[in-house]
Curated annotation (Swiss-Prot):
Complex formation: Interacts with HUS1, HUS1B, RAD1, RAD9A and RAD17.
Gene (UniProt): Rad9b
Phosphoserine, modified sites: 354, 363
GO cellular component terms given for this protein: checkpoint clamp complex; nucleus
Domain of life from the UniProt record: Eukaryota
Protein name: Cell cycle checkpoint control protein RAD9B
Organism of origin: Mus musculus (Mouse)
Keyword Phosphoprotein applies: yes
Length: 403
């Protein structure tokens, strides 16, 4: 059983979390525990996973029991709630209005009733009740050690929001390129499209613009753009910095927002650059001494001051594929594949690369890696040893919701 209460201001934050997760999938899990209430969502191809954990201290009152019993059989039942996001989203659509008019909100769920009851208590004794029925489905849980990533950045969401405003509205992917002395946001990846019919945008930030800047690996990653916009909006509502954790192309990127009362993490698959992956073992074993020194100072007021740039780590991975009609490039690519096959010890369990390296078509050489969640729920652990090949697509719901 779950029973919790919120004020109007807390309802706005809770509703913004629901709106952000609606960009990931059309399904939402309520996962209560002793620590608090977690909202989870994963898209159909398992390339994007997001969860927001509200601490028990976030709510006015929080009551949870791990089991419930049916009146006729007295069998214990776990509370596993899977809701349709289209049923929940309209309840939290007008967040500014809810913040002003709602004095109290309660959320009650029971496993034997198969429904979640959300009640709003407003001024002048007005009460509004929503009954949302759920399916009994255990949520997907993953374990990803984001603190072990080579590159860790922390930036104020307003700066990144102003940067992505330069991108076109129909943008589907965004590229982050980092070196120890620079961060670059691009609308297209290294393998550019036809510039005669495309708009290419690029913006660079120095390390002094970040609250925390640690780059241990020169890299360039490409991932879906829509989820980035959603978590930036959520980060602004929380007035908390956005943390970015990533390594090399093909391994997931984590966008994280942490506060004393809640924690939000979005794990996104990135595009695989096959030539870069074959040469990545030359870049991975970096000693701590070769990493750029983390910067933990806020952006200075005097922008004219030029900061010292740490020595860059040479990038061994090529940014473009070898020409298809070049015999020398083709033989060089075959040599790299052979050498990578002999001592490839850098398997990444969190991401699975589609086995398409034998294809010659350029359209198949760079694909999204499907995230494979090594730690899943008990019903799915028996399949954890079998990678799931899939291509990342845009999130299930393309609907933009405004706060």
């Amino acid at each position: 059983m779950l029973k919790c209460g919120m004020t109007g201001g807390q309802v706005k934050v809770f509703g913004k979390a629901v709106q952000t997760l609606s960009r990931v999938s059309d399904e939402l899990w309520l996962d209560p525990s002793e620590k608090g209430l977690a909202l989870r969502s994963v898209n159909s191809c398992h390339s994007t996973y997001g969860y927001v954990l509200f601490s028990s201290m976030f709510f006015q009152h929080y009551q949870w029991s791990p089991f419930a019993t049916m009146s006729d059989t007295d069998l214990p039942l776990n509370l596993n709630c899977k809701l349709a996001i289209k049923s929940v989203l309209p309840i939290f659509r007008c967040l500014n209005y809810l913040e002003r008019s709602v004095e109290k909100c309660t959320v009650v769920a029971r496993a034997d009733k198969c429904r979640v009851v959300i009640q709003f208590f407003g001024k002048h004794g007005i009460k509004r009740t929503h009954n949302v029925y759920f399916q009994d489905s255990q949520p997907l849980k993953i374990i990803f050690e984001k603190s072990l990533c080579a590159n860790i950045l922390m930036i104020k969401p307003r700066l990144l929001t102003e940067a992505i405003a330069l991108l076109t509205s129909n943008q589907e992917e965004v590229t982050f390129s980092v070196t120890p002395g620079n961060f670059c946001l691009k609308s297209l990846s290294g393998e550019l499209l036809d510039l005669t019919s495309s708009v290419y945008s690029e913006m660079s930030f120095g390390p002094e613009e970040f609250d925390f800047f640690q780059v241990g690996l020169d890299t360039e990653i490409t991932f879906c753009f829509k989820e980035l916009k959603g978590i930036l909006t959520f980060s602004e509502v929380m007035h908390a910095p956005l943390a970015i954790y990533f390594d090399f192309p093909g391994k997931p990127v984590v966008l994280s927002v942490e506060d004393m009362l809640l924690e939000a993490n979005f794990i996104l698959a990135t595009l695989v650059d096959y030539p870069s992956r074959t040469s990545s073992p030359q870049l991975l074993p970096l000693s701590q001494a070769r990493r750029s020194h983390p910067i933990q100072s806020s952006a200075p007021e005097d922008k004219s001051r030029v900061s010292q740039t740490p020595e860059s780590i040479s990038r061994a991975a090529p940014k473009r594929l070898f020409p298809k009609d070049s015999p020398d490039s083709s033989s060089a690519a075959e040599t790299k594949r052979a050498s990578a096959g002999q001592d490839d010890i850098f398997e990444v369990p969190e991401s699975v690369v589609s086995d398409m390296e034998e294809e010659r078509s350029p359209s198949h050489l760079r694909k999204f890696s499907c995230m494979f969640f090594g730690a899943v729920s008990c019903e799915q652990q028996e399949y954890a040893g079998h990678p799931l090949d899939s291509l990342a697509v845009a999130s299930d719901s393309e609907e933009d919701v405004s706060g």
